[in-house]
Amino acid sequence: LYGVDLVKTYAVNEALSALIMLVALLFVCLTEKKEFLIHCYLISYAFFFLLSFISFSKKFKSITSKLVSSEKINSMKVIKSFANYGLVSMVGTVASTSTSYISLIIIGIHLSHSDAGIYSSVLTIVSILMFFPKLFTQVFLPEFSKLFGEGDNKRIFQIFNKTNSVMILLSALICLIVFIFSHNILSIFGKEFSEGSLILRILIPSLFIRMISIPFVSFLSGTKYVLYPNIGGIIILIISSLCWVLLVPDYNLVGIAIGYTAGIVIGIGYQIFVAILKIKSFSTNY
């Protein structure tokens, strides 16, 4: 939906789906029917799919009416080009999103169940903190893509310039609060989970760089430089995996956290570096 300039509709659908999930989870918790826990997610995503399908169906005619086929398209050429892009995109996306899950698998193999529980609680906090910054992505990405298609590079540079400073200040504030109150935050899951405060603090640099990278990655993904974020995802997995092999035997859970942070900092650092280089070409005349 946000790919066809229906960002508001997408956001409303996602918010309603999240509300459905929260209500379902609350019901499961109050009734203590743990066997229905997975159903909360299934109902939420099914509801989101249904809303999105209905929203897109209503706008389909108005969207397609603006499309004009002025020349013949070579199907094989399009498929080949899409396959080349899709392969890198698929590998990069899988690599970046699977890093946290792979770290849990490594903990399950080499460390104890209590370590896995502590690390899972830390990742849960990180995921929650990333929720609001990620909302910016759903606005930046279609906006950058639209402006790039219109050739309005000046507007892209202006938006990037203004939002970048806001994201840095917001991210610094959030990370500072988490660092100071890490022990209290994790105690929400129980006193024994507060032992993971050191792990959470080690992950804070990765949380900070993920937050501030949102305008940079959205710029790359919304323009012709879409492959660079996927390359960064591959770098994340490679660096993290190497660190885990070297550090986990001696440093256990701390080694897992260091490896995860190292991968994120280097991989996303690469994405930010590339974005800075590319945005300079947009700012040459402004």
Walk through the language-model features, giving the residues of each.
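Membrane-interface junctions at transmembrane-helix termini in multi-pass inner-membrane proteins
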Residues: 1-13, 205-235
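Residue-level signature of transmembrane alpha-helical cores of multipass secondary-active transporters
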Residues: 10, 14, 81-93, 97, ...
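Helix-loop junctions and terminal segments of transmembrane helices
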Residues: 3, 122, 126-151, 219-222
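Interfacial segments at transmembrane-helix termini and the short loops linking adjacent helices
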Residues: 113-114, 179-208
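Interfacial/gating helices of multi-pass transporter permease domains
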Residues: 35-39, 77-89, 104-127, 194-197, ...
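Interhelical loop/hinge segments that connect adjacent transmembrane helices in multipass membrane
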Residues: 8, 35-41, 52-100, 143, ...
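Hydrophobic alpha-helical transmembrane segments
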Residues: 11-62, 235-239, 253-277
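Interfacial transmembrane-helix starts/ends
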Residues: 79, 83, 152-169, 173-180, ...
